[in-house]
C-alpha cells in the first residue's frame, strides 16, 4: 500500500472516530480550508461554542511538526473576538503509546489514546 494512500485511509478512519466522540460531546466535526488553501483536517465544534483544531498525521517528527505548524498558523488567523480561542490544538497520530503536550501547547495524541 502506497504511504499516501494509507494516509488518506487513516485520515478517514480518524474522522469517523472523531465524529463518534464529538457526538457524545454534543458536537460536530468539520473540515476547514480557506481561500489561501490553509486547511485543518478536523474542527471539533461543540454546541456551546467551544472548538478544537485537529491535524491528522501518520506520525514521525517531521509530520508532527508540520501538523503543529499548520495548527499554529490557523489559530493565529482566528478572530478571537468573534470565535474565541480554540480549546485545543491537536495532532492526531497513528503511532505512539501516550499523549503529550508540546512546549508550544499543541497536543500530540496517538489514535489509541482516544477513549471515553
Language-model segments: residues:
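A cross-kingdom feature that marks ATP-driven nucleic-acid transaction machinery
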Residues: 1-116
Amino acid at each position: 500500500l502506497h504511504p499516501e494512500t494509507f494516509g488518506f485511509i487513516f485520515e478517514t478512519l480518524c474522522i469517523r472516530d472523531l465524529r463518534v466522540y464529538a457526538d457524545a460531546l454534543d458536537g460536530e466535526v468539520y473540515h476547514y480550508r480557506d481561500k489561501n488553501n490553509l486547511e485543518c483536517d478536523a474542527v471539533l465544534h461543540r454546541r456551546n461554542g467551544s472548538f478544537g483544531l485537529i491535524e491528522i498525521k501518520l506520525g514521525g517528527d517531521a509530520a508532527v511538526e508540520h501538523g503543529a505548524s499548520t495548527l499554529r498558523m490557523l489559530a493565529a488567523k482566528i478572530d478571537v473576538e468573534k470565535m474565541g480561542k480554540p480549546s485545543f490544538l491537536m495532532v492526531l497520530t497513528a503511532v505512539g503509546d501516550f499523549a503529550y503536550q508540546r512546549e508550544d501547547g499543541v497536543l500530540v495524541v496517538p489514535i489509541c489514546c482516544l477513549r471515553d
